[in-house]
């Protein structure tokens, strides 16, 4: 007789259970990246038409009726959307791999959860940032202005991924450099002990 899913979840290693929210976000990031690829493949012309319509609807002062300026911004907007697709795939994959590495190291559940959430949420947020910047640029008349308007999303998202990745690097170094417990003299790895 098979065990129901919730019972199986309770029997998971504490470190893996702690990683599940971050792994869920990492998987969502992968689906976001793949979904954009499908949407772009099926609707590239419609998306570019929407960007052109947003540029046409912008106030006259934004582009000053300069067709060359409009083309530059529209081309760069499309590149930003492609970056969202690429970042979704790459950051989602990185988040899954690094989270599983942290679990395999036997890291404490709290540390595992923090790292996996930083990787998963950061990857998703940064991917969304590029898509949103691509859509905003056409109406604002500048990719720089679009990025600046979304700095509140880009900075913490990318920062979370970088900090979490550095934390994984530190954990790997600690895994190779056990420390001696002062009272017992036994080798310990305080951040890596799950129990």
Where do the language-model regions lie?
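Polytopic transmembrane helical bundles with strong interfacial aromatic enrichment
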Residues: 2-72, 77-79, 99-134, 155-195
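Individual transmembrane alpha-helix segments
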Residues: 70-94
């Amino acid at each position: 007789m098979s065990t129901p899913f919730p019972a199986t979840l309770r029997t998971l290693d504490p470190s893996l259970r702690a990683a599940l929210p971050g792994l869920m976000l990492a998987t969502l990031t992968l689906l976001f990246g793949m979904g954009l690829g499908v949407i772009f493949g099926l609707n590239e012309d419609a998306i570019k038409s929407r960007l052109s319509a947003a540029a046409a609807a912008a106030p006259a002062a934004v582009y000053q009726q300069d067709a060359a300026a409009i083309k530059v911004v529209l081309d760069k907007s499309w590149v930003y959307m492609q970056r969202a697709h690429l970042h979704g795939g790459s950051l989602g994959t990185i988040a899954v791999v690094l989270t599983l590495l942290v679990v395999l190291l036997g890291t404490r559940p709290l540390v595992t959860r923090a790292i996996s959430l930083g990787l998963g949420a950061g990857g998703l947020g940064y991917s969304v940032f590029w898509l949103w910047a691509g859509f905003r640029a056409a109406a604002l008349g500048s990719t720089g202005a679009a990025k600046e308007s979304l700095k509140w999303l880009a900075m913490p998202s990318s920062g979370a991924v970088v900090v979490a990745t550095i934390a994984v690097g530190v954990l790997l170094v600690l895994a190779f450099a056990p420390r001696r417990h002062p009272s017992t003299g036994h080798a310990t790895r305080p951040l890596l002990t799950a129990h």
